[in-house]
């Protein structure tokens, strides 16, 4: 795991002594932990992940380079308690992730003059070879799943049945979950932007728009295809 090392180097460049990582995507990226409740505190020589009792084992397994701190309550509050005890004068926080209420709770324990708003997404922009492999794997899963779905696209099938079948095919091929809500709309509904699958049955000659993606090791694919039910009319 080199991501946290890049983060520690970035802290020095930004003249920050530490950073509080709260966004789920960033928590996973920098630590490997993919649970729904976890917060990181990182400095040059500190790497802590705060989780509640449900996620201790998962954090120990997936974030081995972080010290796992079991919290009795909210991980954010536990992290704030820890930061309150440190002498750090400049601490980064994800201003686009935290709510006003959450930041108010942080300021109640760590004075406002010690906080610095940051965005961590630029650190993820340039992908490593391993990340690219994961993205390719997600795309291959989605492409193969669509190939498996094509024989099912016929008159009488409903949009929602086909969307479910496509997601099932992706799961069988190793997708963690859909990359986003699967869009599958046919006939006149295919003109809808981001049209959710409905109970509409496909008719012969319908065009079917499918916008979907797979997730592999946290990395997602996104592809859109249009197919015709049977033979398209001259129009």
Regions found by a protein language model. Name each.
Residues 1-235:
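Active-site neighborhoods and metal-handling regions in enzymes and metal-associated proteins
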């Amino acid at each position: 795991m080199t991501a946290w090392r890049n983060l520690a180097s970035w802290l020095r460049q930004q003249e920050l002594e530490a950073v509080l990582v709260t966004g789920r995507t960033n928590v996973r990226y920098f630590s490997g932990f993919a649970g729904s409740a976890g917060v990181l505190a990182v400095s040059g020589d500190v790497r802590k992940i705060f989780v509640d009792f449900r996620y201790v084992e998962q954090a120990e397994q997936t974030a081995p380079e972080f010290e796992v701190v079991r919290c009795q309550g909210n991980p954010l509050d536990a992290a704030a308690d820890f930061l309150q005890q440190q002498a750090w004068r400049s601490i980064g926080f994800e201003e686009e992730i935290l709510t006003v209420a959450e930041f108010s709770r942080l300021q109640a324990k760590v004075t406002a003059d010690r906080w610095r708003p940051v965005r961590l997404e630029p650190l993820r922009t340039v992908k490593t070879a391993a990340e690219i492999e994961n993205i390719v794997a997600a795309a291959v899963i989605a492409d193969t799943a669509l190939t498996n779905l094509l024989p099912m696209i016929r008159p009488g099938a409903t949009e929602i049945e086909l969307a479910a079948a496509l997601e099932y095919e992706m799961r069988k091929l190793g997708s963690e979950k859909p990359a986003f809500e699967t869009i599958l709309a046919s006939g006149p509904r295919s003109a809808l932007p981001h049209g959710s699958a409905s109970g509409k049955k496909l008719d012969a000659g319908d065009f079917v728009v499918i916008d979907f993606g797979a997730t592999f090791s946290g990395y997602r694919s996104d592809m859109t295809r249009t197919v015709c039910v049977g033979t398209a009319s001259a129009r």
